[in-house]
């Protein structure tokens, strides 16, 4: 599985997931008005969202 770890004007960066990590995730945490901290990567289980953010998980490449 290949997950996106970052996006920028120059394109996307990806990582190959380790054995046992079969889910890609994207997690947004609200830092202020229209300002979010975004993290992406591979995981074994979908992380939980906190009260200021949300999480999207998938099992497909490059999402």
UniProtKB/Swiss-Prot annotation:
One GO term describing the cellular component: extracellular region
Xref: PROSITE patterns: SNAKE_TOXIN
Presence of keyword Nuclease: no
Entry's localization field: Secreted
Primary location: secreted
Tissue specificity field: Expressed by the venom gland.
A single MF term (Gene Ontology): toxin activity
Record-linked CDD domains: TFP_snake_toxin (cd00206)
This protein's name: Synergistic-type venom protein C9S3, chain 1
């Amino acid at each position: 599985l290949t997950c996106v770890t970052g996006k920028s004007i120059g394109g996307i960066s990806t990582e190959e997931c380790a054995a046992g990590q079969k889910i890609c995730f994207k997690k947004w945490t609200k830092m202020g008005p229209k300002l979010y901290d975004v993290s992406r990567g591979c995981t074994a289980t979908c992380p939980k969202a906190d009260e200021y953010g949300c999480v999207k998980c998938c099992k497909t490449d490059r999402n």
